[in-house]
Structure formats: structure tokens, C-alpha cells
Amino acid sequence: ARIECRESEKVYHTVENSGGTLTITQVNKKSWIENLADFGYDYRVTVYLPTGIYNAVDFQCSTGNLSIPEGFVFSSMKAKSTTGNLSLSCGVLGEAELKNTTGNILVDKMSPSSLNASVSTGNITLKNGTVGGALKTSSSTGNTRLENMEADSFDAHASTGNITFSHSVCSGQLKAETSTGNVRFDEADCDTMKVKTSTGNVTGVLLSPKIFYATTSTGKVNVPHSTEGGLAEISTSTGNITITIKE
């Protein structure tokens, strides 16, 4: 392995490899005034590894982005960032657990056995992957988008933000819940679904018929009437519900 660290006179890194754990720590000897003047400087750390299959990994980053390109495969993955983005295009064979406090999560072409992605403030984008089991997402403030994804089940929660399922299909149940955001389906599908919003709309196009049970307090409901397909429970307080089936 080769490690490259961008440093300055008073900001440097220590590297330790102990018990199979690689720890890279940034040491900052600057005063707070010097740090203000240094705002925006890119103290990037790059770890070069041969492409191939690796054992379980656990990435933890306090301040900064984590990016892993294609060509790497891990038996399982945990990745956590406090302030920064997670951008992952690597392969994962087992469970993938991704957490971010402030920042976005972008996952492309990952097909783990299960996937759990959560952020406090930021967007979640998952695309072009097949999850062997459950796919779960959670966001406090930010949008969630699943694009060209497949899984056994979808479970998406958002407090303030939209949830979009675009050309994504699960063989089991789809669950989506948001307080002040919308839920949209762009030619998505599932066996059964349970969708709930407080002030958001539920709209879009599904690929197969459903038996709809749709309720709203002050909004409008426009869904197909069918006796075929799985149960689709949709409820909202002040939003509209508009669903069509692709012909």
C-alpha cells in the first residue's frame, strides 16, 4: 500500500498499522486564526491499494470526504463520516452500513447482501445496484433517491425531504414515510406497499396493478380501481395522492 498526504508546516498526519487496522490521524498545530486563514485548503489523504477482494472494512472519517472507486470488493463494509460526503462505487459482498452526520451519500453499482444508509443532514442517492436482502434508508433533512435499484424490500424514511423511486423494483414490501416531503414513483414497482406522509404528495407511475387503499384528510385521491395485485396502503394528511399504472 502507498499513502499520500497533503500537508503544511503545522498540519501533518501520523500513520499507524496495528493489528490489521490502518489509522491515519491529522495533527493540526495551527491557532484558530491560522485555521480561519487556511479555510478551504485541501488536506487530502489518498491510500493506494491493489484492486481485488478484501476482508471486512470499517472506514471512519471526522471531517472530509470518503471516495472509493470501482475495482475494489469488500466482504462487508461500514463507512461513517461526521462532516463530509461518502461516494462509493466499490463492490460489497455482505452487509453495507453507511452513516453520515452532515453530508451526502452517493452509491453507484454496489450490490451487497443488505444495505443501510442514513444521514442527518444531506441527500442519499443509490443507483444501479442489486441488493440481495433489505434496502433501508433514513434521512432527517435531505432527499432520498433510488435509481435503477433492486432489492427484496425497500424501507425509506425521511423527516424533511422527498423520497423518489425511479425504475426501482423490490420483490417484497415497499415502505416509505416522510413528514414534509413528497413520495414519487417513476416506473417503480413492488409486491405490496405502505406509504405515509404528513404534508407531502404521493404521485407517480407503477409497473403493475395494485389494490389501493388510499386516504387523505384534506387532499385529493386519484388512483386506479383494481382487484388484482398486492395491497397498496397510502395515507397523507394534507397532500394529494395520484397514481397511475404503466400500460
Regions found by a protein language model. Name each.
Residues 165, 185-186:
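Structural signature of tandem-repeat unit edges
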Residues 1-81, 87-100, 104-119, 123-139, ...:
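Acidic (Asp/Glu) and glycine-rich low-complexity loops/linkers
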